[in-house]
Every structure is written in C-alpha cells, then in structure tokens.
Amino acid sequence: MPLYEHVFLARQDASTQQVEELTTQMTGIVEGLGGKVTKTENWGVRSLTYRMNKNRKAHFVLLNIDAPSAAIAEIERQERISEDVIRYLSVRVEELEEGPSAMMRKADRDRERDDRGGGFRGERDGGGFRGDRGDRGDRGPRRPRDEETADEE
C-alpha cells in the first residue's frame, strides 16, 4: 500500500480534546478502509505565517499513514466538511520517517536551549555611544574638496 504523510491544521479556538477527537476520527476512517496510522504527532498550537480564515494560530497534527488512496480521499473529504480544520496536506512518500519528525526534534532542541541558563549576562561595558574611534592611520590625508564640483551639484 502507498505511504502518506498527512498534516492538518485545526482552529486555534478548538480545544485539545476536540483536536484529539478529530485525530481519532481520521484514524478510524483510515482503519475502516483497510489502512493503518503508523504515527501520530500533535505539534501543538503554533503561529501561522499569515492569517487563514481569520486565524493567526492553529493546532498542527501529523499522521503517518499506510493506506490505499481511497482512504486519503475520504480523510480529505471529511476535513473539507469539518469547520474545525483550516488546512490539510497529504503527501505520498517512498518511506515513512522513523522516530520523531523534524518539528518535534526542533521543539526538543528549543527546550534544551531554554535550559542553558540564558537571561542576565552580568554587567557590561559600553553599550550605546562608543565614542570617537580616533584617526585611522592606514589612510592618507584627505583630498581637498573641489569647490567647482560642489557648486555644480
């Protein structure tokens, strides 16, 4: 059977429970049509690049699916009908990615980065105006300004 990665975006005002119900509904459709969902990832609420249907944020969900194309067509039909789904995308792939997706790895990396103890960096010199840098010795003296060219401009 063909392999698919399917991502859908649910409205930001939908609760996490509603998003999980949508996910189980999609999983049920796939399994009912002879396929299986090998991985489900909820990426949480993320900001959108631009407004879609008056939404600036959305719940992102990834499904890795091993199913016939009829199952994907039915999922997409149900998502078109659903008012909670803003957008969806199904991509046929040669093989499904094992382990966490790139988005989940990025989220883990960001969490680790937060634990590094950023924040206050101590007292710092300077900041703002740094003063005159002095004469640049590598330059020769300045050329005299041509009075004629200044008058013409």
Swiss-Prot record:
InterPro entries found in the cross-reference section: Ribosomal_bS6 (IPR000529), Ribosomal_bS6_sf (IPR035980), Ribosomal_S6_plastid/chlpt (IPR020814), Transl_elong_EF1B/ribsomal_bS6 (IPR014717)
GO molecular function list: small ribosomal subunit rRNA binding; structural constituent of ribosome
Cellular component GO terms, alphabetical: cytosolic small ribosomal subunit
Region Disordered: start-end pairs: 97-153
Keyword Ribonucleoprotein: yes
Keywords: Ribonucleoprotein, Ribosomal protein, RNA-binding, rRNA-binding
GO annotation (BP), single: translation
Compositional bias annotation for Basic and acidic residues: 105-147
Protein role: Binds together with bS18 to 16S ribosomal RNA.
Similarity comment text for this entry: Belongs to the bacterial ribosomal protein bS6 family.
Name of protein: Small ribosomal subunit protein bS6
Annotated source species: Bradyrhizobium sp. (strain ORS 278)
